[in-house]
Amino acid sequence: MTIAVCPGSYDPVTAGHLDVIERSARFFDEVHVVVAVNAAKTPMFSDATRVDVIRRALDKAGCKNVTVSSTDGLITDYCKKVGATVIVKGLRQNGDYEAELGMALVNRKLAGIETLFLPADPILEHISSSIVKDVARHGGDVTGMVPDCVVPMLADALAEERQRKD
């Protein structure tokens, strides 16, 4: 059985993330989507919220061979724990490749785990979690950029953010 891990901060999960996860689920027997803590980022949503939203979106998509969890440790340690032999990452643009290649080489050195890069669907390659949050912060419509369940959640989080600033 081939097990893959799709790590990310998923803050929030986007249509592009889901596309990569769903495509991965067609190639591998089992896929683990892992909400990973990124010390360089301050998340808008808790780990538990991100896990829950991804689960709901994948249930709606009918992905049966996908597990969703979180970790604050090394992704390679998580891979070893679940028996994963590959990490799957989506690539949108050249900048993604440069950033992800270094991590892929470290993961190979640490644990012998290979990274498979899936190119983004051209229709979705402009979407990132940061862009989604920025568009929403400025009153733009993010429908179609994120799963339907994220739209009201994002609006609520931004309303709370505005209240804290006032």
From Swiss-Prot:
Pathway: Cofactor biosynthesis; coenzyme A biosynthesis; CoA from (R)-pantothenate: step 4/5. GO terms for biological process: coenzyme A biosynthetic process. Its EC number is 2.7.7.3. It holds the Pfam family CTP_transf_like. It catalyses: (R)-4'-phosphopantetheine + ATP + H(+) = 3'-dephospho-CoA + diphosphate. InterPro entries: Cyt_trans-like (IPR004821), PPAT (IPR001980), Rossmann-like_a/b/a_fold (IPR014729). Its cofactor is Mg(2+). It comes from the Bacteria. The record marks H17 as: Transition state stabilizer. GO terms for cellular component: cytoplasm. Its main location: cytoplasm. PANTHER family: PHOSPHOPANTETHEINE ADENYLYLTRANSFERASE. This is Phosphopantetheine adenylyltransferase.
